[in-house]
Regions:
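Conserved S-adenosyl-L-methionine
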Residues: 3-109, 114-118, 125-130, 141, ...
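A conserved structural/catalytic subdomain of Rossmann-like adenosyl-cofactor enzymes
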Residues: 101-265
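Short coil/turn segments at secondary-structure boundaries
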Residues: 1-3, 265
Length: 265
C-alpha cells in the first residue's frame, strides 16, 4: 500500500517536524520517517543548524502489522542511521497498540482507505473512541481517533484519507466527524487531485489536526477556524495515468498553510 513520495513530502513539509516525537501507526516501510529525516537535512542551511545534531532531537515511533514490511522498515532506519522504536513486534494497531503511553508531537499516516476488516468485539469501549465508536465496516475514523489519542497536548497530525471521510454519514461517521470538528481539532483540510495513486482511483484528502490553536511561538490565534486548501487542479501528469506534485506545487500548498498559521490581520 504505497503513498506517493510527493504526498509524503507535502505532509512532512506542512507539519515541520524539526524536533520531538514522530509517530506513524500505519508505517509500512517507514516512508514518513525517511521523509522527516530528509526534511531536517533540506532545511539546515535556511535555519542555520547542523543537520546531524538536529536529528538527535527527533525520536521515531511506528507500528506495522505485516511482518515482512515491519522488518523492511527497521532495515530502512538502520541504513539511514535513524534511531527508532517500532514496538516489540509487528502487530495490529487497534488490537495490540505497541505504544500505549506515547503522546507524540507529530503523528502522520496514510492508512489503507476505507479498511473494512478491522473490528473486534474487544474494541467496543476502547479509550481511544473519545468522539464515538467507529463503524465496524470502515476504519477511517478509527485511525483518526487512534492518532488523536496519541497526540501530545500541543501536537499536530496529518492523515491521508479517502474523500468520503469528509461527508460520509454511514453509521456513526457523521456524528464522530461533528464531534471532532466541535472539539476544534481540525486545523486544515487539503482536497487533492485524482490519479495520484497507482492502486486506487479513489480521490483523497489530507486532514490536518492539532490539539492547540491558541497561537504563540510565531503562530496566530486560530481557535474556531479551519483552513480549506483546494489543490484539485494542482500538479502535472507524470504519464498517461499518474498525476504528481512538483517541488513548486508542494511549496505553494505549504506556504499557504504556514502563511495562514502565522498571519493574523
Amino acid at each position: 500500500y504505497y503513498t506517493p513520495k510527493s504526498i509524503v513530502t507535502l505532509i512532512v513539509e506542512m507539519l515541520q517536524p524539526y524536533n520531538g516525537r514522530v509517530y506513524d501507526p500505519a508505517m509500512g516501510s517507514g516512508g514518513f520517517f525517511v521523509s522527516s529525516d530528509r526534511f531536517i537535512e533540506a532545511h539546515a542551511d535556511e535555519k542555520h543548524y547542523n543537520a546531524a545534531e538536529q536529528k538527535r532531537n527527533i525520536s521515531v515511533y511506528g507500528q506495522e502489522s505485516n511482518p515482512t514490511t515491519w522488518r523492511l522498515a527497521a532495515m530502512n532506519m538502520v541504513i539511514r542511521g535513524i534511531d527508532f522504536n517500532f514496538g516489540k513486534q509487528n502487530a495490529d494497531t487497534f488490537l495490540n497498540d505497541q505504544h500505549p503511553d506515547l503522546r507524540a508531537d507529530f503523528v502522520m499516516a496514510n492508512p489503507p482507505f476505507n479498511m473494512k476488516e478491522w473490528w473486534n468485539a474487544k474494541l467496543e469501549d476502547d479509550v481511544r473512541w473519545q468522539y464515538g465508536t467507529p463503524p465496524q465496516g470502515n476504519a477511517n475514523f478509527a485511525w483518526m481517533q487512534h492518532m488523536i489519542h496519541h497526540l501530545a497536548p500541543k501536537g499536530s497530525m496529518a492523515l491521508l484519507l479517502a474523500n468520503g471521510s469528509m461527508s460520509s454519514n454511514t453509521n456513526s461517521e457523521g456524528e464522530i466527524r461533528r464531534a471532532i470538528i466541535e472539539a476544534d481539532l481540525v486545523e486544515c483540510m487539503v482536497a487533492l487531485p485524482g490519479q495520484l495513486f497507482t492502486n486506487t482511483q479513489i480521490p483523497a484528502c489530507i486532514w490536518l489536526l492539532t490539539k492547540d490553536k491558541s497561537g504563540g511561538n510565531g503562530k496566530a490565534h486560530r481557535k474556531g477556524e479551519v483552513l480549506f486548501i483546494d489543490a484539485r487542479q494542482i500538479g502535472f501528469m507524470k504519464d498517461r495515468v499518474l498525476r504528481d506534485f512538483s517541488t513548486d506545487d508542494i511549496i505553494k500548498i505549504t506556504d499557504t498553510f504556514h502563511g495562514w498559521q502565522a498571519d493574523k490581520d
